[in-house]
């Protein structure tokens, strides 16, 4: 790849209305879409072929610009049902998006709005018409990039000022974003998973009570819990262990979320440590997995480029099976730092990084990937049943089959 620290990159379009300025001075020009403005963020790439709306509304992408490696994004439009952030009015999720091709008119029976208008309404700045393969290769070689994405229909940009902003931004390390995306107060979640015939349902006869600590939770996680018979009480990220226990839960869920897990060390990690000391079943996903590892005495580290996509192979040591899963994280647990009473349960077959753990002798476990998918494969849905079975075991009930039986 040609070095382009002082001039416009070679994969750009002639008439620019948006630009991406990397911290090293590289400038990528294209067509602007979505919101007008400029913002600093980390540039990553996602390899999923579908589910762009779920990806862009995943709160785990707060502080990031998503480069879609699949060239055609926006074909099926958008709708209110596929939004993943818990409070859409707050527009938590990715702040920028990068596409290979221009957005076309949507064609789908569920579409209510085209992607460009939807991006505008959510305040997401987008750039189209660039060589996303070249940008993805750059990220793979140099790592996730700090950058500024800017959109102005006039095409007029102060490049030197934008370069200075990109170079000055400190990035996601030591940045606590969980407090920014969490709910403001507790709420009860009843919505169950979507079906083609009925859409979303509602859980009116719950058998269990799960408290979910919201560090940036996705809706589909909560739906899968309610779909298995749970009443879910969602608490803010800053809730204490005493706050959680006051709800008398049967189990505790630690959600996904954005930012550096170590930056939550002043509030979330101590809370999780106290919860682990109880006999309550605890299940964590993504950021929740990382914070659980910290609470157990482990360490986390910033990854070179992170894992973002719906086609990642993971091995489950507890079953010996390989699953294809969805991932979205830029930090990872250092498996060598885990204490002796913590067992590694899952590992990435791409790079060998830790993807799961459990505490020996306690009903506590977590995974780095996203078993709820949305978007992605459903290979790991069984983990929600594994969590519910820990609750059922404490109640003296017969466990559910971890995998649904064929009809």
Curated annotation (Swiss-Prot):
It is an enzyme of class 6 (ligase). It holds the Pfam family CPSase_sm_chain. Pathway: Amino-acid biosynthesis; L-arginine biosynthesis; carbamoyl phosphate from bicarbonate: step 1/1; Pyrimidine metabolism; UMP biosynthesis via de novo pathway; (S)-dihydroorotate from bicarbonate: step 1/3. Coiled coil: none annotated. L-glutamine binds at residues 60, 257, 259, 287, 290, 328, 330-331. Keywords: Amino-acid biosynthesis, Arginine biosynthesis, ATP-binding, Glutamine amidotransferase, Ligase, Nucleotide-binding, Pyrimidine biosynthesis. Its EC number is 6.3.5.5. GO terms for biological process: 'de novo' pyrimidine nucleobase biosynthetic process; 'de novo' UMP biosynthetic process; glutamine metabolic process; L-arginine biosynthetic process. The active site is at residues 286, 370, 372. It catalyses: hydrogencarbonate + L-glutamine + 2 ATP + H2O = carbamoyl phosphate + L-glutamate + 2 ADP + phosphate + 2 H(+). The keyword NAD does not apply. Residues 1-205 are annotated as: CPSase. Residues 209-397 form the Glutamine amidotransferase type-1 domain. GO terms for molecular function: ATP binding; carbamoyl-phosphate synthase (glutamine-hydrolyzing) activity; glutaminase activity. Small subunit of the glutamine-dependent carbamoyl phosphate synthetase (CPSase). CPSase catalyzes the formation of carbamoyl phosphate from the ammonia moiety of glutamine, carbonate, and phosphate donated by ATP, constituting the first step of 2 biosynthetic pathways, one leading to arginine and/or urea and the other to pyrimidine nucleotides. The small subunit (glutamine amidotransferase) binds and cleaves glutamine to supply the large subunit with the substrate ammonia. Belongs to the CarA family. Composed of two chains; the small (or glutamine) chain promotes the hydrolysis of glutamine to ammonia, which is used by the large (or ammonia) chain to synthesize carbamoyl phosphate. Tetramer of heterodimers (alpha,beta)4. This is Carbamoyl phosphate synthase small chain. The lineage of its organism: Bacteria, Pseudomonadati, Pseudomonadota, Alphaproteobacteria, Hyphomicrobiales.
């Amino acid at each position: 790849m040609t070095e382009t620290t002082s001039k416009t990159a070679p994969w750009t379009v002639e008439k620019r209305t948006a630009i991406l300025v990397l911290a090293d001075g590289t400038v990528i020009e294209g067509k602007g879409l979505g919101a007008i403005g400029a913002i600093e963020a980390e540039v990553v790439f996602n390899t999923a072929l579908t589910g762009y709306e779920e990806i862009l509304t995943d709160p785990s992408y707060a502080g990031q610009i998503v480069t879609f490696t699949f060239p055609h994004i926006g074909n099926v439009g958008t709708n209110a049902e596929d939004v993943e952030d818990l409070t859409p009015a707050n527009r938590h999720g990715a702040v920028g998006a990068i596409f290979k091709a221009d957005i076309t008119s949507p064609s789908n029976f569920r579409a209510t709005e085209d992607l460009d208008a939807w991006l505008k309404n959510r305040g997401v700045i987008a750039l189209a018409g660039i060589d996303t393969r070249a940008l993805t290769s750059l990220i793979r070689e140099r790592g996730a990039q700090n950058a500024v994405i800017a959109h102005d229909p006039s095409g007029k940009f102060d490049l030197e000022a934008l370069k200075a902003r990109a170079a000055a931004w400190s990035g996601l390390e030591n940045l606590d974003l969980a407090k920014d995306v969490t709910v403001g107060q507790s709420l009860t979640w009843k919505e169950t998973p979507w079906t083609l015939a009925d859409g979303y349902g509602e859980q009116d006869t719950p058998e269990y009570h799960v408290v979910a600590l919201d560090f940036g939770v996705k809706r589909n996680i909560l739906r899968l819990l309610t779909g298995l018979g749970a009443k879910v009480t969602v608490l803010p990220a800053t809730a204490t262990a005493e706050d959680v226990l006051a709800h008398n839960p049967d189990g505790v869920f630690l959600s996904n979320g954005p930012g550096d897990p170590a930056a939550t060390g002043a509030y979330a990690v101590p809370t999780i440590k106290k919860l682990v000391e109880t006999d309550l079943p605890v299940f964590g996903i993504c950021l929740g997995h990382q914070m659980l590892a910290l609470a157990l005495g482990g360490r986390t580290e910033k990854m070179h480029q992170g894992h973002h996509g719906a086609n990642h192979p993971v091995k489950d040591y507890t079953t010996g099976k390989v699953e294809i899963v969805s991932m979205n994280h830029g930090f990872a647990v250092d498996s060598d730092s885990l204490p002796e009473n913590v067992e590694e349960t899952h590992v990435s077959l791409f790079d060998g990084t830790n993807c799961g753990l459990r505490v020996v002798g306690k009903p506590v476990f977590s995974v780095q990937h996203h078993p709820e998918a949305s978007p992605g494969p459903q290979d790991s849905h069984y983990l929600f049943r594994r969590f519910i079975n820990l609750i059922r075991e404490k109640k003296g009930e017969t466990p559910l089959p971890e995998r649904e039986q064929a009809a």
